[in-house]
Amino acid sequence: MKKIFTLNLCLAVVASLLAKEEPNILFIAIDDLKPTIGAYTKAVPTPAMDRIAARGTTFLNAHCQQAVCGPSRASAMTGKYPDFTRIWDLKTKIRAIHPEIITLTQHFKNNGFYTAGVGKIFDPRSVDKGADTRSWSEAYTQTWHLKYNKKTGKPIGHYHNLKSKAFAAEDKSANWNAINKKLFANNAWPAVEALDVPDDAYDDGAIAAHAVRSLAKLAKKKKPFFLAVGFKKPHLPFVAPKKYWDLIDPKNIRLEPYQKKPQGAPNYAIHD
């Protein structure tokens, strides 16, 4: 009887320890991605995403709450409908309306996880300068904190082409938004750029490199971690190293037949 009791006690202790072991979470956000990955269709080669889909759960009836960055991300990161958050534009702050709302990353932080983030998770116009400071255990890594390829340097706005760099060089004191407005006004805002440069010459490559370094650092912590990684593509403009463009034959890209503005869509949803 004593042996049975001891065995049961040991099993209970082991079960308790296992129950307390939390998983580490890598949360990846992608901007403006249509369901054209290999898990849904063979339209374009997406081997990395296909591997993730094969190992996990693929949703076949998932819908975006709103096709605008601010409302969509506010909804995803709070678990609330846009009609509840009342974030319908690209300027209203989430906490200006809901000061005590609990975000996804904040919930994990409140429950013992170490939370960190890089890139575009919240729309920056919907949160404070710290990308909703209370959601993170450490300072959030904004795009301007990233390390870019040493040879190319960081992109000007989104670009590395000489025309865009020339316009931006005229006013070196201008911030990111001012530079982009100037590029747009001077027709130096191309929809596509395909230069023969390394991944980390552009934002998403630099974001990925930072995420890899963060994973290695966070793995050494005693706490479980939640790392949020927000990629900016395939949102316009379509800028990426040439090697990725070379994977696809332009002749195989089908233009969607419907080219009109959807009824009720805000103007800035189609300004690109």
Q: Locations of the language-model features?
A:
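Formylglycine-dependent sulfatase
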Residues: 2, 18-272
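Sec-dependent N-terminal signal peptides
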Residues: 4-14
